């Protein structure tokens, strides 16, 4: 429940209040309204709802329909003139975040909040953190791959970082379920679209940065993408930063006045004696660790998670147990064919993560390597060039280009765009299942490998704006072993 008087105080303190318009009249103060629900979905609105108008696709008819079933007040950047009072603000998403916190009783102040940002590795690092904190605490997890608010039931999120109203509601649910910590991934879009406005994290972790999500509907430039990633540092009490990341110097200067730990190159927290399923750490996490996820980059993610948890009181024993217990669906999952060849299923969906994946596989598999991948339609268009230029440096690969969430684009046209940057022949098969069947048929012996990149554990393809059922790369690999 929230009163209109409280709404006005919060918005005025945030310098985000313009006025309330009722017909031809303008008000600076208002009273007599109490709201029992808050929503940005007009289909959920009724007489007791504080309704937010957000999004460029919002239509006046949505509001008119809500008014017809009893809606009596709304918050917006525009007066739609539908016969009820409107509270006008400069930024409705900003307002939505702060008012959601008040409505749900400020759960963000009662949970320990950990957030991860980076171009790659957010999900894996969040999983490491969840397993570490689960040893002695009761964490909730908000992840691209899986979300749990009670530690028992898991569901998939549609956004890396939910809309602020949904996010705060989930925090309240986690608190009601007796959770002590909340671990989440924070995308650059989360800051660009004010989904985490007003939140302060106990620990923020910056894993890495590389050009990605650059396109008409995401970030116009790399600078804009990088800036929005760095905002997590400004909104965290303590930070963990990968000192080996590109453009580290600006991040180092930005966090100088904060509590911080660096890990990786030229720091005291490094990895030595890196093996396929174990590593030794130096510095604050000094010791030997078992790990199920192969690849040095996964070991670095484990160190980042360990340092973050250490700041929240986790013991080294908890950190070791948590790292050893972590596996992630669709992240470096390995199957073995009847002929002994390995099949790697991984979510690698940009140039940097694909480069890391190739490096790990080529380190352990010395025979023929078949790579299957595609690029998403209508988003992240820069990835196509990144993939093509990277693959052009690996003429030893057998490459099959296929569909990966083509959306409104032709998957073969996307494949042609990737192939235009590759100087050796590649195969193009639009049907992903047929492409996987073909890829697995090309191996001959132990030492050979197939890499199924991009989809990870996703059991759908996005086609013409809809999620179409898809068995999943792992299930199809099992089918054709």
From Swiss-Prot:
DNA-binding found in the keyword field: no
Record-annotated disulphide pairs: none
Domain of life per record: Bacteria
UniProt-annotated binding residues for UDP-N-acetyl-alpha-D-muramoyl-L-alanyl-D-glutamate: 42, 160-161, 187, 195
Location(s) in or outside the cell: Cytoplasm
Any one of the GO BP annotations: peptidoglycan biosynthetic process
Pfam families, A to Z: Mur_ligase_C, Mur_ligase_M
Main location: cytoplasm
Post-translational modification: Carboxylation is probably crucial for Mg(2+) binding and, consequently, for the gamma-phosphate positioning of ATP.
Pathway: Cell wall biogenesis; peptidoglycan biosynthesis
Keywords of this entry: ATP-binding, Cell cycle, Cell division, Cell shape, Cell wall biogenesis/degradation, Cytoplasm, Ligase, Nucleotide-binding, Peptidoglycan synthesis
First-level EC class: ligase
Entry GO terms, CC: cytoplasm
Motif (L-lysine recognition motif): 404-407
Annotated binding of ATP, by residue: 118-124
GO MF: ATP binding; magnesium ion binding; UDP-N-acetylmuramoyl-L-alanyl-D-glutamate-L-lysine ligase activity
The enzyme's E.C. designation: 6.3.2.7
Modified residues (N6-carboxylysine): 229
TM segment ranges: none
Record's function text: Catalyzes the addition of L-lysine to the nucleotide precursor UDP-N-acetylmuramoyl-L-alanyl-D-glutamate (UMAG) in the biosynthesis of bacterial cell-wall peptidoglycan.
Family: Belongs to the MurCDEF family. MurE subfamily.
Entry protein name: UDP-N-acetylmuramoyl-L-alanyl-D-glutamate--L-lysine ligase
Annotated source species: Streptococcus sanguinis (strain SK36)
Organismal lineage: Bacteria, Bacillati, Bacillota, Bacilli, Lactobacillales
Gene coding for it: murE
């Amino acid at each position: 429940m929230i009163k209109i008087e409280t709404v006005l105080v919060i918005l005025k303190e945030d310098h985000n209040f313009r006025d309330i318009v009722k017909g031809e009249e303008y008000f600076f103060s208002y009273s007599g309204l109490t709201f029992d629900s808050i929503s940005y979905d007009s289909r959920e609105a009724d007489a007791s709802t504080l309704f937010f108008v957000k999004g460029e696709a919002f239509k006046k008819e949505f509001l008119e329909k809500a008014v017809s079933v009893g809606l009596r007040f709304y918050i917006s950047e525009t007066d739609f003139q539908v016969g009820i009072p409107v509270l006008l603000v400069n930024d409705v998403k900003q307002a939505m975040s702060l008012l959601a916190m008040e409505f749900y009783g400020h759960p963000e102040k009662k949970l320990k909040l950990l957030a991860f940002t980076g171009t790659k590795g957010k999900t894996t690092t969040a999983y490491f953190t969840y397993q570490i904190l689960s040893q002695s605490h009761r964490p909730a997890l908000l992840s691209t791959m899986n979300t749990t608010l009670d530690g028992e039931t898991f569901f998939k999120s549609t956004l890396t970082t939910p809309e602020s109203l949904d996010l705060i509601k989930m925090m309240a649910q986690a608190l009601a379920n007796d959770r002590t910590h909340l671990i989440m991934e924070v995308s650059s879009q989360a800051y660009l679209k004010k989904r985490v406005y007003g939140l302060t994290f106990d620990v923020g972790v910056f894993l890495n940065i590389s050009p990605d999500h650059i396109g008409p509907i995401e970030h116009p430039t790399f600078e804009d993408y990088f800036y929005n990633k760095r905002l997590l540092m400004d909104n965290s009490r303590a930070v963990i930063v990968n000192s080996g990341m590109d453009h580290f110097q600006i991040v180092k200067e930005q966090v100088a006045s904060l509590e911080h730990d660096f890990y990786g190159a030229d720091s005291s927290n490094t990895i030595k004696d890196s093996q396929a399923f174990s590593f030794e750490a130096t510095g604050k996490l000094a010791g030997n660790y078992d790990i199920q996820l192969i690849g040095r980059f996964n070991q670095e993610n484990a160190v980042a998670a360990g340092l973050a948890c250490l700041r929240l009181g986790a013991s080294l024993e908890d950190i070791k147990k948590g790292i050893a217990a972590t596996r992630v669906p669709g992240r470096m999952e390995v199957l073995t064919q009847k002929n002994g060849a390995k099949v790697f299923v991984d979510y690698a969906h940009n140039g940097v993560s694909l480069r890391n994946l190739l490096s790990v596989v080529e380190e352990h598999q010395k025979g023929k390597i078949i790579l299957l991948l595609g690029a998403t339609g209508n988003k992240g268009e820069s990835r196509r060039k990144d993939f093509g230029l990277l693959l052009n440096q690996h003429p030893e690969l057998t490459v099959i280009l296929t569909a990966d969430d083509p959306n409104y684009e032709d998957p073969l046209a996307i494949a042609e765009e990737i192939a235009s940057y590759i100087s050796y022949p590649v195969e193009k098969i639009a049907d992903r299942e047929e492409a996987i069947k073909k890829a697995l048929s090309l191996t001959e012996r132990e030492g050979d490998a197939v890499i199924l990149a991009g989809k990870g554990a996703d059991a759908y393809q996005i086609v013409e704006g809809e999620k179409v059922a898809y068995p999943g790369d792992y299930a199809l690999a099992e089918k054709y072993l």
